[in-house]
Amino acid sequence: MTDTATARIPSIPRRAFLGGSATAAALGAFAATGLARQGTAHARPGDGEAGTSASSTVPMTVGRGMADMTGEPLGAGMNGYAVLEQQTSGLRQRQFARAFVFDDGNGGRVAHVTADMGLMFQSIQLEVIRRLQARFGDTYHEGNVLIGASHTHVAPGGTSGHLMVDLTTLGFRPVTFEATVTGIVLAIERADADLAPSQIALTRGTVADAGINRSRGAFDRNPDADKAVFPDGVDRDSVTLHVIRDGAAIGLINWYGIHPTTFGPEHTIISGDNKGYAAWLAEHKAGVDHTNPAEAPYVAAFAMSAPGDVSPNHGLVPNSGPGEGNEYESARILGRRQLDGITGRAIALGGGGIDARHQWVNMREVKIEGRWTPDGQPGTTGPAILGAAFAASSQEDGGGEPMLGFNEGSRGGTPWVRQVNQVAVPASASAIHGAKENLLPVGYIPGLVQQTHVFHLHRIGGIVIASLAFEPTVVAGLRMRRAIAEALDVPMDVVIVQGYVSGYGHYITTPEEYEQQDYEGGATIFGRLTLPAATQIFDGLAAAMRSGVPVDAGAPEGDLTGKIPPSPMGNPLVDVAPLGKNFGDVLSAPEGPVAAGTAVAVAFAGANPNSDLRHETGFLSVEKQDGTRVADDSHEATVIEWNKEAAQTTATITWDSSGAAPGEYVIRYRGSARGIGGGLTPFEGSSTVTVA
């Protein structure tokens, strides 16, 4: 199925969608296309789109909200690279949950959340739903709550209900789990309270020079028709759902496929990476105070699409992004480029209300019809096995352990694993996993990895979102979009595939890419035919949606939530100030005036930050003498790091004073000290710095 022609909107400056009076230009631009008439906003669930008028905006009741969900910034294992030594030591950017609730007035409702974290897990999804139902009854449930991870690799982990992931963070982290769940629930509650008549619009823009295909040899195994869609191996399309209310843009959800692996595994300071920076910058330009997200006038969620084989490291080695060796600058550049992609051609929407189908599927044993397989023969998936190429990690982005000698297929693979497979792997497993050098049979040990996954299909005012727990490659995402568009009889332009939602199932490559056995193929855990299985599942959901019939939703499989031992690392005991000092006292600071542009560092007698994560208040601020705040611990100009020796903790705040006007500035540090009895005592310290 091919994309249909869509109306174009005039080129709009980026700030046109970023709040303030300029946002009126956005609605005017849509109106200028002649397509801004009212669509059919309240179709019954199951209604098709036949007979509705295509519009560039569709009426919909929408609410948006955001909340702080920052996890433990000291001593917590980070989630993404599986490097045990990568434990949090500071905070460059707070983590946020950004939620949108869509309601069609006819019983159709969807909550869509983007969370600044490495991976999403069933444990988080189900706990969020339990808490929402305690407040809202059955308004929110497994079928209408989508929680996606941004996939940053520099945020605390230890929040999975499956053992393998939590092993990489040396155990479960209850404090970070609670921070994550509480933040997501609060964001949805705020979005629910914000529900009001709005309009939604969809644009497709282009993101230039953000990402490179890190497994080009595998990509090139695909048929020419697939490769022709992505000449450089990357999907440059940026898809944005804009929310407009009373003539002003009040939020957006953007989908673009790129890995947030700008920061390598040696980096231990919490950051949202390129997607987190794009979201912060959009909101900052719109006047959002990130210490008070409850009052945010604009919410910008930069979600994932299908980035499985797309790296931000343009030199195809770690730390080779556009910042020329500066990881943070690379994240900023790539974030700005994604923000630049939020405008583009308006996509005509067929209108309609909200419709949804979801299904829990045991991925160990999906029977696949021949029409979905490369050779036309029926096939099956199998219990999860991770290959040697997975253990090698993506050698373009980092992770893995070189001393173990594992390699991706493009680098020769791992011959000794192949030899072991010949005698140790059952023929049935070998048939399913094919070219994979089978290393870790994680699916044969209960509780190690999630194997029953939920697949969601939602239609919101003509926009179709297919979400799943996997990391699809670029072409895998394309094939799923094609199948869904054909089954629903809608243009491909309105179909979005989003990974990292409601769980984690590792990768999905095409069967052709799988044969290469690069990292992505080694991490396609259910076998060579995982993509045909997922495509068949989505085809079934789409067919049911088009016909207006329900599906058997199935049920999640139990996990080990509450049974995985907590991590012993970074847990606060008692805090002790240095001899002769009080908590908050300045230990070191610049002597005399500093030139604008200087990185100003002030060290304080601190406390373990894990005792009090200071959500929506913050650990630091930089203020003018009149109290006007110029930066906080979400701002791009600041970073706070903690160094703990025995019971003493030093907190060092670094402020980039670039652009600061001459004058005096106060750098404030806030924390809470834990006493012998476990009680917390808040404290504050400050240092005045003169910028010459």
Regions found by a protein language model. Give the residues of each.
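C-terminal region of N-terminal signal peptides and the immediate post-cleavage residues
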Residues: 30-53
